From Swiss-Prot:
Keyword vocabulary terms for this entry: ANK repeat, Cytoplasm, Phosphoprotein, Repeat, Ubl conjugation pathway
Protein name according to UniProt: Ankyrin repeat and SOCS box protein 8
Chain's gene name: ASB8
BP term (GO), one: protein ubiquitination
Residues with the Phosphoserine modification: S17
Post-translational modification: Phosphorylated by TBK1.
Domain SOCS box: 235-288
Family assignment from sequence similarity: Belongs to the ankyrin SOCS box (ASB) family.
Amino acid sequence: MSSSMWYIMQSIQSKYSLSERLIRTIAAIRSFPHDNVEDLIRGGADVNCTHGTLKPLHCACMVSDADCVELLLEKGAEVNALDGYNRTALHYAAEKDEACVEVLLEYGANPNALDGNRDTPLHWAAFKNNAECVRALLESGASVNALDYNNDTPLSWAAMKGNLESVSILLDYGAEVRVINLIGQTPISRLVALLVRGLGTEKEDSCFELLHRAVGHFELRKNGTMPREVARDPQLCEKLTVLCSAPGTLKTLARYAVRRSLGLQYLPDAVKGLPLPASLKEYLLLLE
């Protein structure tokens, strides 16, 4: 082997070793106790190198280190790069930390980036009920009705967990409440699936009431019969049967139609400008 080739190989190995140490330092796995992120980058660590499935920027978001996220971006980390799971750093940040989300968005992160399952960061923020991340993403242009591989929206993801705070914010931004996924489920039916497992709390009940107000009318029955899992809970079955049997009133159906006609915008601001009495504005905003 020529000396020049040996030097090149040694240089590559050294750079790889530094990059691996960078990942470990960010994740607080102290193989080298005196390592710090800035010194490793100054020494030649590649801020865009992938180790296994991990990239430094994604790792910093996983541990909610906004200062480290900003440092990596300042040093050239690719803000929309994909890791081994085809996820961007924003997908991880959206689950955990508003500060990381804000930094990434400031540096040009795509709020509508898709992972391998076509999930957006907003799907994950809604699922984890990280309400401030939900709001930050929506304010930065995230699609409120983005569809994953199963045609589920962020509202569906929030509803299946009974995440009241996230559901409320998504509805404020005009989320479509009557969306149907590929197997016939709606946001409200996803929430019912949680309630029938006996996992509902007062917050989940409030979430159901909010979705019911937003949808105006819903139907869970097939050929007039409730699903078996609902029928196993007599009290819940009776409540849902009454709601499904009652036709939507003109008032509730008009509320749904008006909200939808306002389009994809922040509805509290849009409704505020309508020439309507205060009581009707509150009604449109699902406050009663």
